[in-house]
Amino acid sequence: MDKIVKSSKSYKKYIMPSGIIRNVQGYEPFALDILLKTYQEEQIKTDRYDLPVINYTYNDKTKRYFPDIWIPHINLIIEVKSQWIYNKQLEINKSKEKYTKDCGYEYEVWIFDRKANKIVPYLV
């Protein structure tokens, strides 16, 4: 397992319907609960090694973005955030979105409150 994942205290264990355990962060479990109502778990990628890496520029520096969730068969990347974190890092999030779309991916930001309510549509 990835050294970062092992040492990080911010990761949570999420048990998929098959019993496979995935390491997720923040509000990602809320998104997975929703996605598993529509997609098979094999169609939902969350492991860093299964995700595309998007290079983006912010403040004249090239950075690497590892998406939260990727659904390859529909080419959709989903970024999962709390409203507070999304707004706090607004310019970075917009840069990630732009470069992800420029790479040809569909892109959605899913914002949740603490009670697992998805805020739709989310307006800044």
What is the meaning of each model-derived region?
Residues M1-V124:
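Nucleic-acid endo/exonuclease domains
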